[in-house]
Amino acid sequence: MRILYHHRIASKDGQITHIEEMVDALRALGPVVEIVGPDVHIADTGQGGSAGWVGRLKKTLPGVLYELAEAGYSLVAYRRLRAAIRAFGPDVIYERYALYQPAGVWASRRTGIPLLLEVNAPYALARRKYNQLRLGWLADSFERYTFRGADRVFPVTQVLGDMLVAMGVQVGRIRVIPNGINPKAFEALPSTEAAKACRGLADRLVVGFIGFVREWDQLDRIVDWLAARPARDPATLMVVGDGPVRPALEAQARRLGIAHKLVFTGVVPRHEVPAHAMAFDIALQTALVPYASPLCLFEYMAMGKAILAPDQPNHHEVLRRGIDCDMYDPHAPGGVESRLDALVADAALRGRLGQGSRQALTDRAYVWEGNARRVAQAATELARSSAPAR
C-alpha cells in the first residue's frame, strides 16, 4: 500500500503533531507514505504560530486578497500533487482538509486515484464565526465541492460528521476518527508532586491548561476566580504554552494582586509538554466549537488528570460526566467557577476522575495506531475497488 499524504499546514502546533503522529503510525503498520506540502521550514517550537511568510501575508494583505491568494495556491498545490503522483505512484491520496484547497479532488478525478479526506473543522463556518472570512460564498462553494468529492471522509467527531451529511456528503462515505495520543510520549513521566517541585509549585493546587491561549478560551474568568478565593488559597493557574492574550492575562493578575498565582511556561517543544503538564491537579478544557476533537483532551486522559470540560456534544462522544470527567455549562454565569470550587475542595473526587480518564483512554483505544489501522483499512478497500478502472 502506497499512500500520498497531502496537506497545507505551515505551522508547528497541534495540526502538525496530528500529521506527524498519523504518518508515523501508518508507516509502522506497513504502508509506504510520502508527504507533499508547503515548502516551509518550521522549527520545533511547540504550540502555535505560523511560518514567517504565512504570518506576514495574513497581517499585510486585506482579507479579500488573502483569501484569493489561498484559492490561488490551490493551483500550485495541484501541480505539486500531480508531480508527486507521477514520481511516487500512490494507491490512494490522503488529504488533510483546508479551506480553498480542492487540489486533492482535482487530482483524484484526473487520475482515478481514490481520495481520503481528513476533516478537523468546517473552516468556512469556523472563520465566519470569528469574522475572518470575506468571500463567504466562494468559501462555501469550495468547501462543499471538496467534501462531496472525496471517496472517504474522516471527520474527528460525530457532530462534525452530521454537519457533513447536511452539506451533501453521503453517509456511507463517512468514518468518524477522533484524535488520539502516542502512548510512548507518556512513558516515564514524573509524578505530579515531582513535576510541581521542579517548577516551584510544591505547595500549590494547580489548575492547568495546554495550548496557545486566545481570547475565546476565556482564561480571564479563571484569573478572576483565583482572585476571588482566599488570599492563602493554594489554587494556581498554569498554562503550558503561550498565546496572544498572555500579556493581558498577566496584567489582569498583577492588577488583582495574584501575579504569583498565574504561571506561563511559554512555548515549549511538543515532546516536553507532558512532563510540564504532569504538575496539573485539574486539567481544564475550555469551551470550544461543538465539533472539535482537541488533542489536549486525550493528553489529559493519558496523564490520568481530573478533567473539567464544557458540557457539549463533542465531549460526550469521549467523556462521561462523573466517571472520567466533570463538566460545566459554558454559557452559564459561574458555571466553570462553581465546578472548579467543587474539584478544589474534593481531592478524592479528583483522584477518581483522574483514574477514570486514564482507564477510558485505554478502554476506547484513543491512540494513533488505532486511527491508522482504520485509515489503512479504508485505503485498502478503496484501492482494490478502483484498481480495475486504473
Regions from the PLM with identified roles:
Residues 321-322, 326-334, 342-348:
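Conserved acidic donor-binding segment of nucleotide-sugar-dependent glycosyltransferases
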Residues 79-83, 102, 106-109, 134-155:
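Membrane-proximal helix-turn-helix segments that form the acceptor-binding/catalytic region
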